[in-house]
């Protein structure tokens, strides 16, 4: 939503309306939602679909067979991976300069954070969350 031109987005994931999953709940409310099913998404006539690599394979494959351009965005396993996602999404939306600017800003803010003197162990628990482990953010 931050990188798209006005009118460029047709729909957003239902997860974007969940305050436990999205930092842009209010903005997402301005768009029709989808649940990621190929039939529902196809009927919205998109020319591009941004999908996570964990999106149902059948949906991604069917959309591609129907001629829809699908760009898969891998999950961020580390904070450093977020900048790569920004660049990928910016390029996919036809705004690589926006993706690059956002990624550089993110990297600068990340670099400005203090580095702890030693590793810190932490555990996270929250409703509807995911289990954290090796190789996760």
Where do the PLM segments sit?
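A short, structured surface patch at a secondary-structure boundary
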Residues: 1-54
């Amino acid at each position: 939503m931050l990188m798209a031109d006005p009118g460029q987005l047709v729909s957003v994931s239902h997860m974007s309306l969940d305050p436990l999953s999205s930092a842009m709940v209010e903005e997402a409310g301005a768009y029709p939602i989808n649940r990621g099913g190929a039939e529902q998404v196809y009927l919205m006539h998109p020319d591009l679909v941004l999908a996570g690599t964990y999106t149902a394979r059948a949906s991604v494959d069917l959309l591609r067979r129907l001629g829809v351009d699908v760009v898969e965005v891998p999950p961020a396993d580390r904070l450093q991976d977020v900048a790569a996602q920004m660049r990928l999404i910016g390029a996919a939306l036809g705004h690589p300069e926006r993706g690059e600017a956002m990624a550089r800003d993110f990297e600068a803010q990340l670099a400005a954070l203090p580095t702890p003197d030693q590793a810190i162990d932490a555990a996270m628990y929250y409703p509807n969350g995911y289990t954290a482990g090796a190789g996760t953010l």
